[in-house]
Amino acid sequence: MHVSSALVSYSQLLRLLSDGKERQSRNVWFVLLSFLTHAAMVSKLLDPIRPEGAKEDRGTALRKHLEVEVGSAILSRAARDNLEHIDERIDRWTKRGLTSVLEMVFEDRAGFEFIAHEDAAIRRVLIQDEMIFISEDR
């Protein structure tokens, strides 16, 4: 279910990004969040947080069967941790007294680096040509 849902969300994301009117809409973030949430669930199945007993056996068997290599992007905890710790980032933004929040799709990293500054919290940014999702310092 999570793999299929991640694939559907990713297809929707690509469609929205190719549409000039939708590219900066909230819909992009809805489907990106859906994709990341489902990908995080797949990651947890493949690489449990506390791999003990049945969880460890399941993760090992699934990674072997699906030929998921060590270092695969799906095993990274960065994206799933990012989703799960939004409350901590909001607390940091408030404490720093930030005056703006950056939430945008950029065609490339140069555009992002041009507009990003210390007084803006990076809520969520997508760098389209790399398909890289950035939130705060991640």
Residue ranges and their predicted role:
Residues 70-94:
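Histidine-centered, metal-coordinating catalytic motifs and their short helical/loop contexts
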